[in-house]
Amino acid sequence: ELKLSRQALKRWFSDKYLENNPDTYKKISSILSANNMANFLRVYELFVKHKNDEDFEKIQSKTLVMTGEHDIGSTIEMSQQLNNIIKNSELKIIKDGKHLCGIECADDVNLAIKNFVDKNE
């Protein structure tokens, strides 16, 4: 198991979730460990050097902006900024969520999506 995998998993999930879900830990760790690390690091470099020059203000569709409360990769502040730029957007912060709250907090994420879709049909 690579140190990089362990670090990523600690950023993406709460300690409690990882303790209670060892199979998920092993599966995702295995996927990360099987990655070509040179390519993996090149992709991460894109995130670091990325210029925020998208035309988000041109988005006309109703948009759900969502992040986990404890996500250090897609922070609440980043999501608030995006929510302010996209005119028809709604911000949802998933309580206790980290980067992969779609897995760890699946019920909350799914409910937020369902509520957003139901409200905007």
Descriptions of predicted regions:
Residues L2-E57:
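Conserved alpha/beta-hydrolase catalytic His-Asp/Glu region
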Residues A8, Y44, L82, V109, ...:
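Hydrophobic "lid"/C-terminal helical patch
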Residues M37-A38, I59, K98, E104:
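Conserved Class I S-adenosyl-L-methionine
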Residues I59, V65-T67, D71:
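Short beta-strand/loop motif that positions the catalytic acidic residue
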Residues Q60-S61, N88:
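Active-site acidic short loop of glycosyltransferases
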Residues I72-M78:
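Conserved alpha/beta-hydrolase "acid-adjacent" motif
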Residues Q80-S89:
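Active-site-adjacent alpha-helix of alpha/beta-hydrolase-fold enzymes
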Residues S89-E121:
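Catalytic active-site module of serine/aspartate enzymes centered on a nucleophile-bearing elbow/loop
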